[in-house]
Protein backbone atom coordinates (compact mmCIF):
# COMPACT_ATOMS: atom_id res chain seq x y z
CA UNK A 1 0.00 0.00 0.00
CA UNK A 2 2.83 2.33 0.89
CA UNK A 3 4.58 1.68 -2.43
CA UNK A 4 1.35 2.28 -4.35
CA UNK A 5 0.78 5.59 -2.55
CA UNK A 6 4.35 6.70 -3.25
CA UNK A 7 3.94 5.81 -6.91
CA UNK A 8 0.73 7.84 -7.11
CA UNK A 9 2.49 10.92 -5.76
CA UNK A 10 5.12 10.83 -8.52
CA UNK A 11 2.67 10.98 -11.46
CA UNK A 12 3.53 13.90 -13.73
CA UNK A 13 6.21 15.19 -16.10
CA UNK A 14 8.65 18.03 -15.51
CA UNK A 15 9.79 20.33 -18.37
CA UNK A 16 12.84 18.21 -19.25
CA UNK A 17 10.99 14.87 -19.04
CA UNK A 18 9.33 13.12 -21.97
CA UNK A 19 6.30 10.79 -21.74
CA UNK A 20 5.96 7.58 -23.76
CA UNK A 21 4.96 8.16 -27.38
CA UNK A 22 1.26 7.32 -27.05
CA UNK A 23 0.96 9.43 -23.89
CA UNK A 24 2.94 12.20 -25.55
CA UNK A 25 0.47 12.23 -28.44
CA UNK A 26 -2.62 12.25 -26.21
CA UNK A 27 -1.26 15.04 -23.99
CA UNK A 28 -0.34 17.06 -27.09
CA UNK A 29 -3.84 16.69 -28.60
CA UNK A 30 -5.30 17.88 -25.31
CA UNK A 31 -3.13 21.02 -25.42
CA UNK A 32 -4.28 21.71 -28.99
CA UNK A 33 -7.94 21.38 -27.97
CA UNK A 34 -7.41 23.82 -25.09
CA UNK A 35 -5.69 26.51 -27.19
CA UNK A 36 -7.87 26.08 -30.29
CA UNK A 37 -11.04 28.07 -29.40
CA UNK A 38 -9.32 31.31 -28.37
CA UNK A 39 -6.81 31.25 -31.23
CA UNK A 40 -9.54 30.68 -33.81
CA UNK A 41 -11.81 33.32 -32.21
CA UNK A 42 -9.14 36.01 -32.67
CA UNK A 43 -8.84 35.13 -36.36
CA UNK A 44 -12.61 35.27 -36.85
CA UNK A 45 -12.90 38.63 -35.08
CA UNK A 46 -9.94 40.36 -36.76
CA UNK A 47 -10.49 38.94 -40.25
CA UNK A 48 -7.10 37.20 -40.37
CA UNK A 49 -6.96 33.91 -42.25
CA UNK A 50 -7.95 31.09 -39.88
CA UNK A 51 -5.54 28.55 -41.33
CA UNK A 52 -2.61 30.99 -41.16
CA UNK A 53 -3.46 31.97 -37.59
CA UNK A 54 -3.45 28.33 -36.43
CA UNK A 55 -0.21 27.62 -38.32
CA UNK A 56 1.44 30.75 -36.87
CA UNK A 57 0.54 29.75 -33.30
CA UNK A 58 2.25 26.39 -33.78
CA UNK A 59 5.35 27.84 -35.41
CA UNK A 60 5.66 30.62 -32.80
CA UNK A 61 5.31 28.06 -29.99
CA UNK A 62 8.17 25.95 -31.36
CA UNK A 63 10.36 29.07 -31.70
CA UNK A 64 9.43 30.18 -28.17
CA UNK A 65 10.37 26.83 -26.62
CA UNK A 66 13.67 26.64 -28.53
CA UNK A 67 14.62 30.24 -27.69
CA UNK A 68 13.85 29.66 -24.01
CA UNK A 69 16.13 26.57 -24.13
CA UNK A 70 13.18 24.20 -23.55
CA UNK A 71 13.04 25.43 -19.96
CA UNK A 72 9.66 27.24 -20.08
CA UNK A 73 6.66 25.08 -21.06
CA UNK A 74 4.23 27.64 -22.50
CA UNK A 75 2.00 27.62 -25.59
CA UNK A 76 1.88 30.76 -27.75
CA UNK A 77 -1.55 31.70 -29.07
CA UNK A 78 -3.36 34.72 -30.52
CA UNK A 79 -4.13 37.47 -28.00
CA UNK A 80 -7.44 39.33 -27.67
CA UNK A 81 -5.54 42.36 -26.39
CA UNK A 82 -4.60 43.32 -29.96
CA UNK A 83 -8.10 42.94 -31.45
CA UNK A 84 -9.07 46.62 -31.06
CA UNK A 85 -5.84 47.94 -32.56
CA UNK A 86 -5.83 45.51 -35.48
CA UNK A 87 -9.56 46.00 -36.13
CA UNK A 88 -9.28 49.81 -36.11
CA UNK A 89 -6.25 49.69 -38.39
CA UNK A 90 -7.87 47.39 -40.95
CA UNK A 91 -11.09 49.44 -40.91
CA UNK A 92 -9.31 52.81 -41.28
CA UNK A 93 -9.98 55.07 -44.26
CA UNK A 94 -6.30 54.89 -45.23
CA UNK A 95 -6.70 51.18 -46.04
CA UNK A 96 -10.28 51.41 -47.36
CA UNK A 97 -9.31 50.57 -50.94
CA UNK A 98 -6.91 47.76 -50.02
CA UNK A 99 -7.68 44.05 -50.36
CA UNK A 100 -7.87 41.82 -47.26
CA UNK A 101 -4.38 40.45 -47.84
CA UNK A 102 -2.99 43.97 -48.27
CA UNK A 103 -4.60 45.04 -44.98
CA UNK A 104 -3.18 42.00 -43.22
CA UNK A 105 0.27 42.77 -44.67
CA UNK A 106 0.16 46.28 -43.16
CA UNK A 107 -0.97 44.90 -39.78
CA UNK A 108 1.84 42.32 -39.90
CA UNK A 109 4.45 45.07 -39.77
CA UNK A 110 2.92 46.52 -36.60
CA UNK A 111 2.75 43.03 -35.06
CA UNK A 112 6.42 42.38 -35.80
CA UNK A 113 7.39 45.74 -34.28
CA UNK A 114 5.29 45.00 -31.17
CA UNK A 115 7.59 42.04 -30.60
CA UNK A 116 10.42 44.49 -29.96
CA UNK A 117 8.51 45.92 -26.96
CA UNK A 118 8.47 42.53 -25.24
CA UNK A 119 12.09 41.85 -26.20
CA UNK A 120 13.26 45.21 -24.82
CA UNK A 121 11.23 44.61 -21.65
CA UNK A 122 12.86 41.18 -21.32
CA UNK A 123 16.36 42.60 -21.74
CA UNK A 124 15.64 45.28 -19.11
CA UNK A 125 14.39 42.63 -16.67
CA UNK A 126 17.49 40.48 -17.26
CA UNK A 127 19.78 43.47 -16.72
CA UNK A 128 18.07 45.47 -13.96
CA UNK A 129 15.38 43.19 -12.53
CA UNK A 130 11.60 43.21 -12.62
CA UNK A 131 11.26 46.47 -10.64
CA UNK A 132 12.78 48.45 -13.52
CA UNK A 133 9.85 47.53 -15.78
CA UNK A 134 7.27 48.18 -13.07
CA UNK A 135 8.55 51.75 -12.68
CA UNK A 136 7.78 52.52 -16.34
CA UNK A 137 4.73 50.24 -16.63
CA UNK A 138 3.07 50.11 -13.20
CA UNK A 139 -0.37 48.61 -12.65
CA UNK A 140 -1.85 52.12 -12.92
CA UNK A 141 -1.01 51.94 -16.64
CA UNK A 142 -1.25 48.27 -17.57
CA UNK A 143 -4.56 47.84 -15.70
CA UNK A 144 -6.46 50.72 -17.37
CA UNK A 145 -4.98 49.83 -20.78
CA UNK A 146 -6.38 46.30 -20.45
CA UNK A 147 -9.74 47.77 -19.38
CA UNK A 148 -10.03 50.08 -22.39
CA UNK A 149 -8.97 47.29 -24.75
CA UNK A 150 -12.06 45.39 -23.58
CA UNK A 151 -14.45 48.36 -23.42
CA UNK A 152 -13.56 49.76 -26.84
CA UNK A 153 -14.65 46.42 -28.32
CA UNK A 154 -18.08 46.51 -26.65
CA UNK A 155 -19.73 48.06 -29.71
CA UNK A 156 -18.34 45.36 -32.01
CA UNK A 157 -19.63 42.64 -29.71
CA UNK A 158 -23.20 43.96 -29.57
CA UNK A 159 -23.27 44.67 -33.32
CA UNK A 160 -22.09 41.16 -34.17
CA UNK A 161 -24.58 39.63 -31.72
CA UNK A 162 -27.51 40.60 -33.97
CA UNK A 163 -25.66 40.76 -37.30
CA UNK A 164 -26.77 39.01 -40.48
CA UNK A 165 -23.45 39.76 -42.21
CA UNK A 166 -22.51 37.10 -44.77
CA UNK A 167 -25.53 35.03 -43.68
CA UNK A 168 -26.99 32.46 -46.06
CA UNK A 169 -30.68 32.24 -47.02
CA UNK A 170 -32.45 35.28 -45.50
CA UNK A 171 -35.28 36.78 -47.57
CA UNK A 172 -36.09 40.50 -47.39
CA UNK A 173 -39.39 39.89 -45.56
CA UNK A 174 -37.53 37.71 -43.02
CA UNK A 175 -34.92 40.28 -41.98
CA UNK A 176 -36.77 41.41 -38.84
CA UNK A 177 -37.40 37.84 -37.69
CA UNK A 178 -33.86 36.78 -38.63
CA UNK A 179 -32.40 39.64 -36.55
CA UNK A 180 -34.44 38.56 -33.51
CA UNK A 181 -33.38 34.95 -34.00
CA UNK A 182 -29.76 36.10 -34.27
CA UNK A 183 -30.20 37.63 -30.81
CA UNK A 184 -31.46 34.26 -29.56
CA UNK A 185 -28.41 32.47 -31.00
CA UNK A 186 -25.98 35.00 -29.50
CA UNK A 187 -27.67 34.83 -26.08
CA UNK A 188 -27.58 31.03 -26.08
CA UNK A 189 -23.88 31.18 -26.99
CA UNK A 190 -23.14 33.77 -24.30
CA UNK A 191 -25.08 32.12 -21.47
CA UNK A 192 -23.89 28.59 -22.27
CA UNK A 193 -20.26 29.78 -22.41
CA UNK A 194 -20.67 31.47 -19.02
CA UNK A 195 -22.38 28.41 -17.48
CA UNK A 196 -19.70 26.07 -18.85
CA UNK A 197 -16.90 28.32 -17.55
CA UNK A 198 -18.44 28.45 -14.06
CA UNK A 199 -19.67 24.90 -13.56
CA UNK A 200 -17.41 22.63 -15.63
CA UNK A 201 -14.40 21.36 -13.71
CA UNK A 202 -11.03 19.83 -14.56
CA UNK A 203 -9.93 19.69 -18.19
CA UNK A 204 -13.52 20.27 -19.34
CA UNK A 205 -13.49 23.55 -17.47
CA UNK A 206 -10.81 24.80 -19.88
CA UNK A 207 -13.09 24.47 -22.91
CA UNK A 208 -16.07 26.83 -22.45
CA UNK A 209 -15.04 28.77 -25.58
CA UNK A 210 -15.40 25.52 -27.52
CA UNK A 211 -18.64 24.22 -26.00
CA UNK A 212 -20.50 27.56 -25.99
CA UNK A 213 -20.22 28.15 -29.76
CA UNK A 214 -21.08 24.50 -30.46
CA UNK A 215 -24.38 24.95 -28.57
CA UNK A 216 -24.97 28.25 -30.38
CA UNK A 217 -24.44 26.54 -33.74
CA UNK A 218 -26.88 23.78 -32.76
CA UNK A 219 -29.56 26.42 -32.10
CA UNK A 220 -28.75 28.11 -35.45
CA UNK A 221 -29.14 24.72 -37.17
CA UNK A 222 -32.53 24.14 -35.50
CA UNK A 223 -33.64 27.61 -36.66
CA UNK A 224 -32.54 26.81 -40.21
CA UNK A 225 -34.49 23.53 -40.25
CA UNK A 226 -37.61 25.07 -38.65
CA UNK A 227 -37.83 28.42 -40.46
CA UNK A 228 -35.51 28.19 -43.47
CA UNK A 229 -33.52 31.17 -42.15
CA UNK A 230 -29.83 30.37 -42.59
CA UNK A 231 -27.63 32.29 -40.17
CA UNK A 232 -24.48 30.36 -41.10
CA UNK A 233 -21.96 32.43 -43.02
CA UNK A 234 -21.45 31.79 -46.72
CA UNK A 235 -17.93 30.67 -47.62
CA UNK A 236 -15.97 33.14 -49.77
CA UNK A 237 -15.19 32.31 -53.39
CA UNK A 238 -11.53 31.91 -52.44
CA UNK A 239 -12.34 29.03 -50.05
CA UNK A 240 -10.64 25.79 -51.06
CA UNK A 241 -12.81 22.76 -51.81
CA UNK A 242 -9.97 20.24 -51.46
CA UNK A 243 -9.00 18.18 -48.43
CA UNK A 244 -5.62 19.79 -47.82
CA UNK A 245 -4.32 23.25 -48.70
CA UNK A 246 -1.43 25.33 -47.44
CA UNK A 247 -2.30 28.40 -45.34
CA UNK A 248 -2.33 31.79 -47.06
CA UNK A 249 1.02 33.41 -46.28
CA UNK A 250 1.52 37.16 -46.76
CA UNK A 251 4.62 39.29 -46.34
CA UNK A 252 4.60 42.34 -44.02
CA UNK A 253 4.33 45.78 -45.59
CA UNK A 254 6.14 48.62 -43.73
CA UNK A 255 3.69 51.17 -42.30
CA UNK A 256 4.18 53.69 -39.50
CA UNK A 257 0.41 53.75 -39.06
CA UNK A 258 0.55 50.06 -38.10
CA UNK A 259 3.46 50.70 -35.71
CA UNK A 260 1.59 53.47 -33.88
CA UNK A 261 -1.63 51.43 -33.75
CA UNK A 262 -0.31 48.03 -32.66
CA UNK A 263 3.13 48.38 -31.07
CA UNK A 264 2.03 50.05 -27.77
CA UNK A 265 -0.52 47.29 -27.08
CA UNK A 266 2.35 44.96 -26.15
CA UNK A 267 2.57 46.72 -22.79
CA UNK A 268 -0.80 45.23 -21.83
CA UNK A 269 0.45 41.66 -22.31
CA UNK A 270 3.55 42.05 -20.11
CA UNK A 271 1.72 41.76 -16.73
CA UNK A 272 -0.22 38.74 -18.02
CA UNK A 273 2.96 37.04 -19.21
CA UNK A 274 4.66 37.86 -15.91
CA UNK A 275 1.80 36.35 -13.91
CA UNK A 276 1.94 33.20 -16.05
CA UNK A 277 5.64 32.56 -15.44
CA UNK A 278 5.24 32.94 -11.65
CA UNK A 279 2.17 30.71 -11.71
CA UNK A 280 4.10 28.09 -13.68
CA UNK A 281 7.04 28.33 -11.27
CA UNK A 282 4.78 27.35 -8.35
CA UNK A 283 3.23 24.38 -10.17
CA UNK A 284 6.50 22.95 -11.49
CA UNK A 285 8.45 23.30 -8.25
CA UNK A 286 5.58 21.70 -6.36
CA UNK A 287 5.69 18.71 -8.73
CA UNK A 288 9.50 18.54 -8.52
CA UNK A 289 9.27 18.47 -4.74
CA UNK A 290 6.71 15.65 -4.83
CA UNK A 291 8.88 13.68 -7.26
CA UNK A 292 11.87 14.32 -4.99
CA UNK A 293 13.81 15.83 -7.86
CA UNK A 294 17.18 17.34 -6.98
CA UNK A 295 16.99 19.75 -9.92
CA UNK A 296 15.85 23.31 -9.24
CA UNK A 297 13.36 24.78 -11.71
CA UNK A 298 13.70 28.49 -10.99
CA UNK A 299 11.26 29.72 -13.63
CA UNK A 300 10.55 32.92 -11.70
CA UNK A 301 14.15 33.96 -12.43
CA UNK A 302 13.53 33.45 -16.15
CA UNK A 303 10.97 36.27 -16.54
CA UNK A 304 13.32 38.20 -18.84
CA UNK A 305 13.85 35.15 -21.06
CA UNK A 306 10.09 34.56 -21.10
CA UNK A 307 9.38 38.11 -22.33
CA UNK A 308 12.08 37.80 -24.99
CA UNK A 309 10.47 34.54 -26.13
CA UNK A 310 7.09 36.28 -26.29
CA UNK A 311 8.56 39.01 -28.45
CA UNK A 312 10.15 36.50 -30.82
CA UNK A 313 6.79 34.71 -30.97
CA UNK A 314 5.08 37.94 -32.07
CA UNK A 315 7.70 38.51 -34.75
CA UNK A 316 7.46 34.96 -36.10
CA UNK A 317 3.65 35.02 -36.11
CA UNK A 318 3.58 38.45 -37.72
CA UNK A 319 6.06 37.48 -40.41
CA UNK A 320 3.93 34.59 -41.74
CA UNK A 321 0.59 36.43 -41.47
CA UNK A 322 -0.71 35.56 -38.00
CA UNK A 323 -2.00 37.92 -35.28
CA UNK A 324 0.05 39.04 -32.30
CA UNK A 325 -0.22 36.80 -29.27
CA UNK A 326 0.94 35.78 -25.84
CA UNK A 327 1.45 32.62 -23.82
CA UNK A 328 -1.85 31.01 -22.90
CA UNK A 329 -3.17 30.71 -19.36
CA UNK A 330 -5.62 28.04 -20.57
CA UNK A 331 -2.73 25.74 -21.41
CA UNK A 332 -1.07 26.40 -18.05
CA UNK A 333 -4.30 25.38 -16.31
CA UNK A 334 -4.48 22.20 -18.41
CA UNK A 335 -0.88 21.39 -17.48
CA UNK A 336 -1.60 22.05 -13.80
CA UNK A 337 -4.59 19.69 -13.86
CA UNK A 338 -2.75 16.87 -15.65
CA UNK A 339 0.66 17.65 -14.07
CA UNK A 340 2.25 17.40 -17.53
CA UNK A 341 4.74 20.25 -17.99
CA UNK A 342 6.91 18.52 -20.60
CA UNK A 343 8.15 20.88 -23.32
CA UNK A 344 8.21 17.87 -25.67
CA UNK A 345 4.41 17.70 -25.35
CA UNK A 346 4.07 21.36 -26.38
CA UNK A 347 6.38 20.91 -29.36
CA UNK A 348 4.25 17.99 -30.59
CA UNK A 349 1.09 20.05 -29.92
CA UNK A 350 2.54 22.86 -32.05
CA UNK A 351 3.31 20.43 -34.90
CA UNK A 352 -0.25 19.04 -34.71
CA UNK A 353 -1.64 22.60 -34.90
CA UNK A 354 0.44 23.29 -38.01
CA UNK A 355 -0.86 20.09 -39.65
CA UNK A 356 -4.48 20.91 -38.72
CA UNK A 357 -4.12 24.35 -40.33
CA UNK A 358 -3.79 22.61 -43.71
CA UNK A 359 -7.00 20.54 -43.26
CA UNK A 360 -9.48 22.50 -45.40
CA UNK A 361 -12.84 20.97 -44.28
CA UNK A 362 -12.18 21.98 -40.66
CA UNK A 363 -11.13 25.50 -41.66
CA UNK A 364 -14.30 25.91 -43.77
CA UNK A 365 -16.51 24.72 -40.89
CA UNK A 366 -14.93 27.28 -38.58
CA UNK A 367 -15.34 30.07 -41.14
CA UNK A 368 -19.06 29.28 -41.59
CA UNK A 369 -19.88 29.94 -37.90
CA UNK A 370 -22.79 32.42 -37.66
CA UNK A 371 -21.73 35.99 -36.87
CA UNK A 372 -24.27 35.89 -34.02
CA UNK A 373 -22.34 33.02 -32.41
CA UNK A 374 -19.13 35.05 -32.60
CA UNK A 375 -20.98 38.09 -31.18
CA UNK A 376 -22.23 36.14 -28.17
CA UNK A 377 -18.72 34.90 -27.54
CA UNK A 378 -17.30 38.42 -27.91
CA UNK A 379 -19.57 39.81 -25.17
CA UNK A 380 -17.99 37.38 -22.70
CA UNK A 381 -14.40 37.58 -23.97
CA UNK A 382 -14.16 41.36 -24.32
CA UNK A 383 -15.74 41.85 -20.91
CA UNK A 384 -13.22 39.39 -19.47
CA UNK A 385 -10.35 41.48 -20.89
CA UNK A 386 -11.69 44.58 -19.11
CA UNK A 387 -12.17 42.58 -15.90
CA UNK A 388 -8.57 41.38 -16.16
CA UNK A 389 -7.46 45.02 -16.13
CA UNK A 390 -9.28 45.54 -12.82
CA UNK A 391 -7.71 42.33 -11.50
CA UNK A 392 -4.22 43.68 -12.31
CA UNK A 393 -4.85 46.79 -10.18
CA UNK A 394 -6.41 44.79 -7.33
CA UNK A 395 -3.53 42.30 -7.33
CA UNK A 396 -0.98 45.12 -7.16
CA UNK A 397 -3.00 46.91 -4.45
CA UNK A 398 -3.13 50.19 -6.39
CA UNK A 399 -3.84 53.15 -4.08
CA UNK A 400 -7.10 54.58 -5.46
CA UNK A 401 -6.88 57.55 -3.07
CA UNK A 402 -3.63 58.78 -4.64
CA UNK A 403 -4.16 61.90 -6.78
CA UNK A 404 -1.39 60.79 -9.11
CA UNK A 405 -2.88 57.32 -9.64
CA UNK A 406 -6.37 58.73 -10.22
CA UNK A 407 -4.99 61.21 -12.79
CA UNK A 408 -3.17 58.50 -14.76
CA UNK A 409 -6.05 56.00 -14.65
CA UNK A 410 -8.71 58.62 -15.47
CA UNK A 411 -6.95 60.03 -18.53
CA UNK A 412 -6.12 56.60 -19.96
CA UNK A 413 -9.73 55.45 -19.55
CA UNK A 414 -11.38 58.51 -21.10
CA UNK A 415 -8.92 58.96 -23.98
CA UNK A 416 -9.22 55.27 -24.86
CA UNK A 417 -12.98 54.81 -24.53
CA UNK A 418 -13.83 58.34 -25.69
CA UNK A 419 -11.63 58.04 -28.76
CA UNK A 420 -13.41 54.85 -29.78
CA UNK A 421 -16.96 56.16 -29.49
CA UNK A 422 -16.33 59.77 -30.56
CA UNK A 423 -14.05 59.13 -33.54
CA UNK A 424 -14.47 55.44 -34.32
CA UNK A 425 -11.12 54.42 -32.88
CA UNK A 426 -8.73 56.97 -34.43
CA UNK A 427 -8.35 60.38 -32.77
CA UNK A 428 -7.57 63.23 -35.22
CA UNK A 429 -4.58 65.20 -33.90
CA UNK A 430 -2.66 67.75 -36.01
CA UNK A 431 -3.40 65.87 -39.22
CA UNK A 432 -2.60 62.48 -37.70
CA UNK A 433 -5.06 59.69 -36.87
CA UNK A 434 -3.93 58.39 -33.48
CA UNK A 435 -5.38 54.96 -32.54
CA UNK A 436 -7.28 55.52 -29.29
CA UNK A 437 -5.83 52.64 -27.26
CA UNK A 438 -2.26 53.34 -28.36
CA UNK A 439 -2.72 57.07 -27.78
CA UNK A 440 -4.15 56.48 -24.31
CA UNK A 441 -1.30 54.12 -23.40
CA UNK A 442 1.42 56.52 -24.59
CA UNK A 443 -0.22 59.50 -22.85
CA UNK A 444 -0.55 57.49 -19.63
CA UNK A 445 3.12 56.44 -19.68
CA UNK A 446 4.32 60.02 -20.23
CA UNK A 447 1.95 61.47 -17.62
CA UNK A 448 3.04 58.88 -15.05
CA UNK A 449 6.72 59.65 -15.67
CA UNK A 450 6.13 63.41 -15.32
CA UNK A 451 4.06 63.05 -12.14
CA UNK A 452 6.70 60.73 -10.66
CA UNK A 453 9.35 63.47 -10.63
CA UNK A 454 7.87 65.43 -7.71
CA UNK A 455 7.02 62.45 -5.48
CA UNK A 456 10.51 61.02 -5.94
CA UNK A 457 12.07 64.25 -4.69
CA UNK A 458 9.62 64.49 -1.78
CA UNK A 459 10.28 60.85 -0.87
CA UNK A 460 14.04 61.48 -0.92
CA UNK A 461 13.63 64.57 1.30
CA UNK A 462 11.44 62.59 3.72
CA UNK A 463 13.99 59.75 3.85
CA UNK A 464 16.84 62.24 4.46
CA UNK A 465 14.79 63.94 7.20
CA UNK A 466 14.09 60.58 8.86
CA UNK A 467 17.80 59.68 8.75
CA UNK A 468 18.72 63.07 10.21
CA UNK A 469 16.20 62.64 13.04
CA UNK A 470 17.55 59.15 13.76
CA UNK A 471 21.10 60.52 14.00
CA UNK A 472 19.94 63.29 16.37
CA UNK A 473 18.14 60.78 18.57
CA UNK A 474 21.23 58.56 18.68
CA UNK A 475 23.39 61.56 19.64
CA UNK A 476 20.97 62.48 22.43
CA UNK A 477 21.03 58.91 23.77
CA UNK A 478 24.82 58.79 23.49
CA UNK A 479 25.22 62.03 25.41
What are these regions (language model features)?
Residues 45-50, 177-181, 185, 192-279, ...:
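Flexible hinge motifs at transmembrane-helix junctions and intramembrane kinks/re-entrant loops
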Residues 22-186, 358-361, 368, 372, ...:
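Early transmembrane hairpin of solute transport permeases
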Residues 2-22, 45-48, 83-101, 348-477:
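Transmembrane alpha-helical segments and their short flanking loops
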Residues 31, 39-40, 57-65, 87-89, ...:
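Hydrophobic core segments of alpha-helical transmembrane domains in multi-pass membrane transport
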Residues 1-26, 167-174, 231-248, 282-305, ...:
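Intrinsically disordered, low-complexity non-transmembrane regions of multi-pass membrane transporters
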Residues 37-39, 75-82, 322-331, 344-345:
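Transmembrane helix boundary and interhelical junction motifs in multipass membrane proteins
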Residues 13-15, 19-22, 44-65, 268-343:
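Membrane-embedded helical hairpins/re-entrant loop segments and their flanking transmembrane helices
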Residues 66-76, 132, 197-208, 338-343, ...:
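Membrane-helix interface "capping/anchor" motifs
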